[in-house]
A protein has these predicted regions:
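Hydrophobic beta-strand scaffold residues
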Residues: 70-71, 165
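A short, well-structured juxtamembrane/interface segment
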Residues: 45-66
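Generic N-terminal amphipathic, Lys/Arg-enriched alpha-helix
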Residues: 1-6, 12-48
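Flexible, glycine/charged-enriched surface loops at secondary-structure junctions
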Residues: 49-55, 99, 235-237
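Structured helix-beta-strand junction loops
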Residues: 66-67, 135
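Glycine-rich phosphate-binding loops that contact phosphosugars or nucleotide phosphates
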Residues: 78-235
């Protein structure tokens, strides 16, 4: 999905809509080659995340094996990534196996707009975490910047309820990284530490500043999660 669709607030700026001369196909192909090269460099840098990705998959497999569930949320393109992930868990990834409990909190437009209208868009995920999350569950938050207020609120609600929070993050990690590292609660009041999960959170920050490359890395990490969760719960295929 186009990076502008991710409403983290710091995505690529909208370009001018003034008419432009169409480029020759050879020049367009060269642009595509440059994108492949850029994506390859980003993916190579992401190898440094392997241990964190493995630890996150282990935490999710442990939760599922113990009767827990995976909650997922994100905005825009990251919401689509969340739907992708929950769908792979509920149905299957590469093998036929029993369905796994996963809920994407960005899927129910009636609930989201109700909360946004009656209270605040900042609370659209947090209230669902409060209602659905139980100690031992895992919340996966997906953001390209770490600065979306509703993601911060969701992570804070998860910590308070005793859920493990796994962040697929980007850029410098933003305020979310600070909260997960320092144990804050996302509302600026350090008096309520919101540390009910015992410090089990995992913050996976995709390298680079390009929103598009960050989203591509997130998609591959999601596939790695699916592969590793299936491996732990069901063995080699």
């Amino acid at each position: 999905m186009h990076s502008d669709c991710d409403s983290d607030g710091d995505g690529d700026r909208v370009a001018s809509t003034a008419p432009a001369a169409l480029l020759e196909s050879a020049e367009l192909a060269g642009r595509v080659d440059a994108m492949w090269d850029d994506a390859a460099r980003a993916l190579e840098s992401a190898r440094a995340l392997s241990e964190q990705v493995a630890a996150a998959a282990q935490a999710m497999a442990r939760a599922l094996d113990g009767g827990g569930k995976i909650l997922v949320c994100g905005n825009g393109g990251s919401a689509a990534d969340g739907l992708h992930f929950s769908g792979e868990l509920l149905n299957k990834f590469r093998r036929v196996r029993r369905p796994l409990a996963a809920v994407c909190l960005a899927a129910d437009v009636s609930t989201i707009t109700s909360i946004a209208n009656d209270e605040s868009y900042d609370m659209v995920f947090a209230k669902q975490v409060e209602a659905l999350g139980r100690r031992g569950d895992v919340l996966v938050v997906i953001t390209t910047s770490g600065n979306s207020p509703n993601i911060m609120r969701a992570a804070a609600a998860a910590r308070t309820a005793g859920l493990t929070c796994i962040a697929l993050n980007g850029k410098d990690g933003g305020a979310l990284s600070n909260m997960l590292r320092d144990g804050g609660d996302g509302d600026g009041d350090d008096g309520d530490r919101g540390d009910g999960n015992g410090g089990r959170d995992i913050d996976i920050i995709a390298p680079g500043d390009s929103t598009a490359r960050i989203q591509e890395i997130h998609a591959i990490i999601i596939h790695a999660f699916c592969e590793l969760i299936d491996l732990q719960l069901f063995g080699e295929s």
